[in-house]
Amino acid sequence: MSGHSKWATIKRKKAVNDAQRSKNFAKLIRLIEVAAKQGGPDLAGNPGLAEAVQKAKKNSVPNDNIDRAIKRGSGLTGEHINYVSLVYEVKAFDGVALLVECLTDNKNRCAAGIRSIVTRSGCSMVNPGSLAYNFKRKGIVVLQDRDANGNLLSEDLVLSAVLEAEVDDIVPTGDCGFEIIAEPSNLSAVCNALRDSGIQYRSVETVYVPNSTVSLPEQKYDRIIRMIEALEESDDVQGVYTNLSGKDLACE
């Protein structure tokens, strides 16, 4: 998502090598399988699956891999998909909090791996609910900067398109585009309203948004960033969200 966005998740600013790309593919395939299992194989009727497929395509996952993942997840191949979704809460220092979103087939392995990284970083895992109140779950739709006719979008045009779809906010991104913030349950209605108005969007995503952000001096800031990067390397981790603000933090 746009680097000008105020909705901060973690974006790592370094090249992705082949090994990391393969790991990312595996995570995205897992996300598709779980979404298909939960809501069925129809993208039009399953916003979670549509979001997972869109994210996979954005990261160049081959269409054949995506199709097979949908079939596996929806039970069409007879394979058993047994992943669970978990969110771990991490207390850092000076008011910094993190939510680590995981998708795993082994809770014990997942928890042990997260705890090891967090402890090495001088931070701690806390009980569910201890820090989650610092964040809200939100859906974000990133728009193209032009409509289907090639005209630059205006905020009035976007607003009129989604007026009935119950959005929370429309945020200019600084590159002539906009982001629409909405409740996750309203994402399907928002996307349908945009399509009906001829407005194209780049991505749809559900994220944890901090209620407020915290700044740290450089040394402590770098420690948090290193921990986040280590967490993102875990096979079980789907996303890391924090209330820390800084140069390395931007929406995907």
From Swiss-Prot:
Does this entry carry the keyword Transcription? Answer: yes
- Give the UniProt keywords, A-Z: Cytoplasm, DNA-binding, Transcription, Transcription regulation
- Molecular function in Gene Ontology: DNA binding
- Alphabetized Pfam families for the sequence: TACO1_YebC_N (PF20772), Transcrip_reg (PF01709)
Subcellular localization is given as: Cytoplasm
Q: Name one GO biological process term.
A: regulation of DNA-templated transcription
Would the keyword Transcription regulation turn up in this protein's UniProt record? yes
One Gene Ontology cellular component annotation held by this UniProt entry: cytosol
The domain of life is: Bacteria
Matching InterPro entries, A to Z? Integrase-like_N (IPR017856), TACO1_YebC-like_2nd/3rd_dom (IPR048300), TACO1_YebC_N (IPR049083), Transcrip_reg_TACO1-like (IPR002876), Transcrip_reg_TACO1-like_dom3 (IPR026564), YebC-like (IPR029072)
Q: Which HAMAP family match?
A: Transcrip_reg_TACO1
For this protein, the record's PANTHER family field holds: TRANSCRIPTIONAL REGULATORY PROTEIN YEBC-RELATED, TRANSLATIONAL ACTIVATOR OF CYTOCHROME C OXIDASE 1
User: Would you identify the family this protein belongs to, as annotated?
Assistant: Belongs to the TACO1 family.
The name of this protein is Probable transcriptional regulatory protein TWT_266
